[in-house]
C-alpha cells in the first residue's frame, strides 16, 4: 500500500465520483415544486373585454370572442340528434330486449330461453318469465 492512498481507493486509478450533498437544498428548485413558480405549460394570458364590431354582428349569428369558445352559445345550424349515443351502448339486437328478460340465469351464463322449459332445476324463477 502506498503511503498517500486509502485502503478503499479503486485499483484502476479512476477518480471517485462526488457524492450528492443531501444535507443542502439544491441551488435552483424544480419549477413545479415552488409555490410561486411560473407554469411552463399554460402561460399567463391577458384577459380583457374585446370590443364587438357591429358591422359583422347580426342578431342571429354568433360573433366576437364567443364564436370559437364556450361551445357556441347559438350555433348557426342545428346539431344532430343524440341517436348515436343510445345505439353505441347496444351495438347489436342480441343485447336489446333479450338481455333484460333472462333473470338471474343470464348472470350465470345459462341460456335465457331455459326459463320457458318445464322441469328446469331453477324452477323458482319460472314466475319471472315473460
Swiss-Prot record:
Organism (species): Homo sapiens
- Give the highest taxon in the source lineage: Eukaryota
Q: Where is the composition biased (Low complexity)?
A: 88-97
Q: What is this protein called?
A: Putative uncharacterized protein encoded by LINC00472
Disordered: where is this region? 1-104
Amino acid at each position: 500500500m502506498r503511503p498517500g492512498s486509502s485502503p478503499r481507493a479503486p485499483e484502476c486509478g479512476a477518480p471517485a465520483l462526488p457524492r450528492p450533498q443531501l444535507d443542502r437544498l439544491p441551488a435552483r428548485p424544480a419549477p413545479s415544486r415552488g409555490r410561486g413558480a411560473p407554469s411552463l405549460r399554460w402561460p399567463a394570458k391577458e384577459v380583457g373585454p374585446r370590443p364587438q364590431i357591429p358591422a359583422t354582428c347580426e342578431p342571429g349569428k354568433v360573433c366576437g370572442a364567443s364564436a370559437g369558445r364556450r361551445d357556441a352559445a347559438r350555433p348557426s345550424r342545428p346539431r344532430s340528434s343524440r341517436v348515436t349515443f343510445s345505439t353505441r351502448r347496444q351495438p347489436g339486437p342480441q343485447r336489446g330486449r333479450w338481455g333484460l328478460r333472462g333473470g338471474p340465469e343470464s348472470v350465470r351464463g345459462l341460456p335465457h330461453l331455459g326459463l320457458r322449459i318445464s322441469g328446469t332445476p331453477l324452477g323458482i324463477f319460472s314466475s319471472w318469465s315473460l
